[in-house]
Amino acid sequence: MTIISVTLEIHHHITERDADRSLTILDEQLYSFAFSTVHITKKRNGGGSLNNYSSSIPLTPSTSQEDLYFSVPPTANTPTPICKQSMGWSNLFTSEKGSDPDKGRKALESHADTIGSGRAIPIKQGMLLKRSGKWLKTWKKKYVTLCSNGVLTYYSSLGDYMKNIHKKEIDLRTSTIKVPGKWPSLATSACAPISSSKSNGLSKDMEALHMSANSDIGLGDSICFSPSISSTTSPKLNLPPSPHANKKKHLKKKSTNNLKDDGLSSTAEEEEEKFMIVSVTGQTCHFKATTYEERDAWVQAIQSQILASLQSCESSKSKSQLTSQSEAMALQSIQNMRGNSHCVDCETQNPKWASLNLGVLMCIECSGIHRSLGTRLSRVRSLELDDWPVELRKVMSSIGNDLANSIWEGSSQGQTKPSIESTREEKERWIRSKYEHKLFLAPLPCTELSLGQHLLRATADEDLRTAILLLAHGSREEVNETCGEGDGCTALHLACRKGNVVLAQLLIWYGVDVMARDAHGNTALTYARQASSQECINVLLQYGCPDECV
């Protein structure tokens, strides 16, 4: 039966209602007949190549009769081959009725790994909701990629990613990740008692440390820590439930597969699906996944990349790239200070990371734990990767590990300090006890003065050790206490009057008000100019002190 007879027979029996279905049948028969004819021709000629069959249907008739018979056998005997070819071509490649309208978009997303030639291949990518930084706080879809170079990039759409435009990047080397309503990633609310040969004797102290409220929040009798990240393997996510998880449990709903454009959901669901990336500058980016599982996968991948990038990155500055020989000597002098040849918390040799407000050096593993404490307690910076302005170099050169430990471990009560062989969990227990809970902090000196007045005297006397001890014990209100007798000066005024940039910088980190004025209406900047201390001037301007001379 020829193609013409097949066509006439089918069109003779079809109705207008079944036109679409019959045309599909016609397409299938045309394709089957064409393929069988080509196969016969190949066998008759003793073989031949059939690769790229779709290109064998020409848009115009061929000049060779033999080629015409091979290429378009279904229409070789028809008086109007071009029309028939056009019909067959359009029907074969026309999408069927009821096809998925998102098919094209899904195909693009499924091949996203092949998009963006020449760029770093993402180790994780997908659509997330990101909260805008504007006052409306709306959630918008972003296409997010995580690359092995330690950079998280987000785009307005998949199309922008393909074109590599309208992107914003987050450097994970100077960032940390947080999940609202969760304990720190290395902590869990309940676990078996710790009985290790390497125990540092903190179990009892940790049980007694500020745990009187545990019975009120349902945590049980104690809190202990469980391992989640080792120094030799990539970190694994271990996010224990929030202390209020039981109260929210009945509010949780099953996750859906579609992103919610309006971001409206129950409070508990929002809490569970969100995570935040906080940079060292304090900038926070809020993201939200579609499901809890997707959120956990992103958090684990980002945490792994933070650790991996810190471990694998090399110094971006060599000795020849230092701005001056004096800067190189200053950094070397920091490393040569007493106690700075070993990590302040675990005694690992040759530490390359620093905590600015503590004035200490530490190893890379302890720096990760310090970073999780937040910038309020520890401002982590790399000796090799970051820039070191003169005021920061002076802070580090004035304190050092020995002086800091005489304060923060002043009453350690014979506890065994972690060593290089200690597990990460033992190091974290020690660090949190030392800086967060202040278990080992040296006691305040006996004096009739209040802490705030004592701090003012120590600043006026430029007694750095006493000032650090008082700042560690003090509150923001005590740090901002003013001199009596109507003077109105804060400790920052006194530090700038002396031109002491180390005390000025420490006071700012511990919460002193840089906008405060004394009884004469002068800010600390006025006293810094009177003392001709350009370093104090730079620090004050950096933190927003009003410059009335401009």
Curated annotation (Swiss-Prot):
Residues 328-448 form the Arf-GAP domain. Keywords: ANK repeat, GTPase activation, Metal-binding, Repeat, Zinc, Zinc-finger. It comes from the Eukaryota. Residues 232-270 are annotated as: Disordered. Residues 245-255 have a biased composition (Basic residues). ANK repeats lie at residues 487-516, 520-549. Residues 121-307 form the PH domain. The keyword Zinc applies. A zinc finger (C4-type) spans 343-366. SMART domains: ANK, ArfGap, PH. GO terms for molecular function: GTPase activator activity; GTPase activity; zinc ion binding. Transmembrane segments: none annotated. InterPro entries: Ankyrin_rpt, Ankyrin_rpt-contain_sf, Arf-GAP_GTPase_ANK_PH, ARFGAP/RecO, ArfGAP_dom, ArfGAP_dom_sf, PH-like_dom_sf, PH_domain. Putative GTPase-activating protein. Belongs to the centaurin gamma-like family. This is Arf-GAP with GTPase, ANK repeat and PH domain-containing protein 11. It comes from Homo sapiens.
